[in-house]
Swiss-Prot record:
Organism: Chilobrachys guangxiensis (Chinese earth tiger tarantula)
NADP in keyword set: no
Protein name: Jingzhaotoxin F6-27.63
Free-text domain note: The presence of a 'disulfide through disulfide knot' structurally defines this protein as a knottin.
Role: Probable ion channel inhibitor.
Keywords attached to this entry: Disulfide bond, Ion channel impairing toxin, Knottin, Secreted, Toxin
Gene Ontology molecular function: ion channel inhibitor activity; toxin activity
Disulfide bonds: 2-17, 9-22, 16-29
Family according to the record: Belongs to the neurotoxin 10 (Hwtx-1) family. 49 (Jztx-F6) subfamily.
GO CC field: extracellular region
Location of this chain's protein in the cell: Secreted
Coiled coil regions, renumbered to chain: none
Pfam families, A to Z: Toxin_12 (PF07740)
Length: 35
């Protein structure tokens, strides 16, 4: 299952939900305003 907003993400964790992406700096699922 994917993770929602403000959830931990990364190489060893589940992917973020649709419309979200993993922040490369803080390793959280964040909104992607460009998509």
């Amino acid at each position: 299952a994917c993770q929602g907003y403000m959830r931990k993400c990364g190489r060893d964790k589940p992917p973020c939900c649709k419309k979200l992406e993993c922040s490369k700096t803080w390793r959280w699922c964040v909104w992607n305003p460009w998509e």
